[in-house]
Curated annotation (Swiss-Prot):
Component of the EKC/KEOPS complex that is required for the formation of a threonylcarbamoyl group on adenosine at position 37 (t(6)A37) in tRNAs that read codons beginning with adenine. The complex is probably involved in the transfer of the threonylcarbamoyl moiety of threonylcarbamoyl-AMP (TC-AMP) to the N6 group of A37. CGI121 acts as an allosteric effector that regulates the t(6)A activity of the complex. The EKC/KEOPS complex also promotes both telomere uncapping and telomere elongation. The complex is required for efficient recruitment of transcriptional coactivators. One of its GO terms (molecular function) is tRNA binding. One of its GO terms (cellular component) is chromosome, telomeric region. It comes from Candida glabrata (strain ATCC 2001 / BCRC 20586 / JCM 3761 / NBRC 0622 / NRRL Y-65 / CBS 138). Pfam families: CGI-121. The gene is CGI121. This is EKC/KEOPS complex subunit CGI121. Its main location: nucleus.
């Protein structure tokens, strides 16, 4: 899935999902050298959560406020409800046991035109990122724990309400 956000026409965003990934450990060992953000799909509750983090990254990039070394590592920090960079990488980044992965790339006009192909990096089945994919692979317990949304709140809320809680935490962190 490739798209642009109207407020940031100089950036093109690419999101690719993989399942049945068999080389997570290998990807994790070289993640710092790759021009992608590799997320553990279990930690993504909704597409809105991803979009909120991406929007925040682009705002911070626009105002030169990135706190990490790259725009791709900033994605993980922006997903986090806290400002701890290491904690964000541990919770949202690819893990050694990740079998479902979401790969993001933010390209601006200064990027090199040729990127390493994701199919040469990820050993797994590429599939379309959809609501169904996210619903199938998310771990509500892990997501609830990270965002401090208890099981009762999740059970008594609609899916959209839980997604809104997460998006609000992403947007309000640090204010």
């Amino acid at each position: 899935m490739n798209f642009k956000i109207p407020q940031f026409p100089d950036f093109e965003i690419s999101i690719t999902a993989f399942e049945n990934v068999t080389n997570s450990e290998s990807i994790r060992s070289k993640v710092a050298t790759l021009p992608y953000a590799f997320l553990d799909a279990r930690m993504i509750y909704s597409q809105e959560q991803l979009y909120a983090a991406l929007y925040r990254v682009l705002v911070e990039q626009n105002y030169n406020k990135l706190r990490t070394k790259t725009i791709h590592s900033e994605i993980m920090l922006c997903l986090s409800p806290t400002s701890n960079i290491g904690d964000a990488f541990k919770k949202f980044g690819i893990k050694e046991d990740s079998s479902t992965v979401i790969c993001l790339h933010i390209k601006d006009r200064s990027d090199e035109p040729e990127l390493p192909s994701l199919s040469s990096i990820v050993e797994g089945q590429e599939i379309s990122l959809s609501k169904e994919f996210i619903n199938q692979h998310r771990d509500i317990g892990m997501v609830g724990h990270v965002y401090k949304i208890n099981g009762e709140m999740i059970e008594n809320s609609t899916e959209d309400q839980v997604s809104s809680m997460i998006v609000n935490m992403i947007q309000l962190r640090g204010l």
